[in-house]
């Protein structure tokens, strides 16, 4: 925010509250409307939001490429096992394609995008999670029934989205969601585990 001359401060507690809104640009708008109501929006507010989000993505990518954001326990192992078993993989997310690309490249492997048959990201559908649209789009593109799939989510909005699409869902919590309840999830785990690491 400092790069844009803004005195906004998203501390850990506030960011946890902002995560109730999916989508980075939507989250910025929500912050202004709900937590910074004295802020006078400039005429180019939509452009400002897009620029803020693009800058955030640049910083995020720099952190990933520098190894400062590790992949969560068990993710790499599970993906490797799924690929060896010939399972079809997809990503259905509200984040931008650039964020997904950076996360896969720097956290998993240079060619990790190719592991997934479909990567549905960002504004590919008009309604973001908790709406099920991103899952419906992915199911249609893969010609799959929800009953043939399992979703992995880490938020209440993600769970609502996948369940509304009819997909059984496993939750892995994070620092922001560890104390949340996830009604309807088939399992709630702190992580996906690494055999041999207790």
Residues of each region from the PLM?
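A structural preference for short, pocket-lining loop segments at secondary-structure junctions
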Residues: 87-89, 93
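Asp-based, Mg2+/Mn2+-dependent phosphohydrolase catalytic module
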Residues: 80, 96-198
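Glycine-centered flexibility sites
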Residues: 21-24, 74, 86, 122, ...
